[in-house]
């Protein structure tokens, strides 16, 4: 049976790049919240972005079951920033007998800030359609993110 690869990591940690590697090596479909929200809302999600993100995540959980049932692997490319989110995913797939793997993309703060600066520069220069992350938003994400315990994940990517 196909499986679900669940990516955990901070914004701008390399999840989307890693998801492409998994897509190629495991013949998987990527379900990315950012791809949809950026396509529909651009940089202007504002206060409604959180609502769209929550609804997309719910939709992607259901859609991933359909995809796996057809025999195709799935990569969930969003952060799973909290233990509660990770626990929900484990329960969701485990209760349905669907195989899953958690992959954590580890990044130190120095490298993270360097990548954020590069991303923001690329966004401003129209070289990237990723989200622009200002200092306030970066600190908000940093305060929310809970680094998983080693026993929470199947693959720890340095």
What are these regions (language model features)?
Residues 7:
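Hydrophobic anchor at the beta1->P-loop junction of P-loop NTPases
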Residues 4:
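Walker A (P-loop) ATP-phosphate-binding motif of ABC ATPase nucleotide-binding domains
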Residues 122-158:
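Small-molecule kinase domains that catalyze NTP-dependent phosphoryl transfer to phosphate-bearing small molecules
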Residues 13, 17-72:
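Conserved substrate/cofactor phosphate-moiety recognition/catalytic segment
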Residues 96-116:
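Conserved phosphate-donor/acceptor-positioning beta-strand/loop module used by diverse small-molecule
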Residues 28-30, 100-104, 152-157:
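Conserved beta-strand scaffold positions in the cores of enzyme catalytic domains, especially
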Residues 52-96, 100:
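Glycine-rich phosphate-binding loop used to anchor ATP phosphates in small-molecule kinases
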Residues 10:
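P-loop (Walker A) phosphate-binding loop of NTP-binding proteins
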């Amino acid at each position: 049976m196909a499986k679900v690869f669940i990516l955990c990591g901070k914004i701008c940690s390399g999840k989307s790049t890693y998801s492409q590697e998994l897509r190629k090596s495991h013949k998987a479909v990527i379900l990315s919240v950012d791809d949809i929200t950026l396509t529909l809302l651009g940089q202007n999600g504002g206060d409604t972005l959180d609502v769209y993100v929550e609804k997309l995540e719910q939709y992607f959980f259901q859609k991933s079951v359909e995809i796996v049932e057809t025999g195709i692997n799935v990569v969930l490319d969003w952060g799973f920033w909290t233990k509660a989110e990770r626990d929900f995913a484990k329960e969701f797939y485990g209760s349905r007998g669907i195989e899953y793997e958690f992959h954590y993309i580890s990044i130190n703060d120095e490298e993270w800030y360097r990548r954020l600066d590069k991303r923001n520069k690329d966004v401003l220069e129209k070289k990237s359609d990723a989200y622009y992350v200002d200092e306030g938003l970066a600190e908000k994400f940093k305060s929310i993110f809970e680094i998983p315990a080693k026993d929470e994940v199947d693959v720890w990517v340095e």
